């Protein structure tokens, strides 16, 4: 994440007069079902610390990455927005989501001042989510985040899909382990509700 602009365009290939090239970046970012760009919010001498589940900026970078227009478009925000995919821009202090109208600020790190640490460090004003969320507090703790459960577990309610126009009922039991009568009852309730 070298540069991003209000439209969600991203430059990861050109740094001043130096052309680094995009490698497989374009193929991956254009074909992934969900795209998460990650990098620091600013460049140059950034020093941060995490204490008491909050992010503290010790020394802020002196080169903004969120600018009016990127020097070179390696990822097109307009094309990405039209694709309907989830596209996120994650930094140490905030998270943006690409919308059809451009970059939208959706999350902020605990300990960060919206005006001083984010908006004043950008060369444009981003769209703002109706409700600005706090980034997951687990990020700012020293222990492991416990992502296995989040990433690999599909809740029972999300394992059933009914398509009424074709009268098709899909059930996804991939990776499911039944360990209790309560789980069986929950499955029965969902199936009965959908099939009524």
Predicted regions and their residues:
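Conserved phosphate- and dinucleotide-binding cores of soluble alpha/beta proteins
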Residues: 1-143
């Amino acid at each position: 994440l070298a540069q991003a602009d209000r439209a969600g365009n991203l430059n990861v290939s050109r740094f001043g007069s130096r052309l680094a090239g995009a490698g497989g970046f374009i193929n991956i970012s254009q074909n992934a079902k969900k795209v998460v760009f990650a990098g620091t919010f600013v460049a140059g001498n950034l020093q941060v610390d995490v204490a008491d589940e909050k992010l503290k900026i010790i020394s802020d970078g002196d080169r903004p990455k969120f600018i009016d227009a990127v020097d070179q478009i390696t990822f097109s925000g307009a094309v990405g927005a039209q694709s309907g995919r989830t596209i996120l821009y994650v930094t140490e202090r905030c998270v943006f989501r690409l919308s059809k109208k451009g970059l939208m600020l959706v999350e902020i790190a605990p300990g960060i001042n919206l005006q001083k640490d984010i908006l004043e460090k950008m060369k444009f004003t981003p769209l703002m989510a109706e409700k600005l969320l706090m980034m997951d507090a687990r990020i700012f703790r020293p222990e492991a985040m416990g992502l296995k459960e989040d990433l690999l577990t599909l809740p029972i309610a999300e394992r059933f899909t009914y398509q009424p126009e074709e009268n098709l009922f899909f059930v996804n039991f991939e990776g499911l382990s039944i360990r209790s009568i309560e789980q069986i009852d929950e499955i029965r309730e969902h199936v009965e509700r959908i099939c009524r």
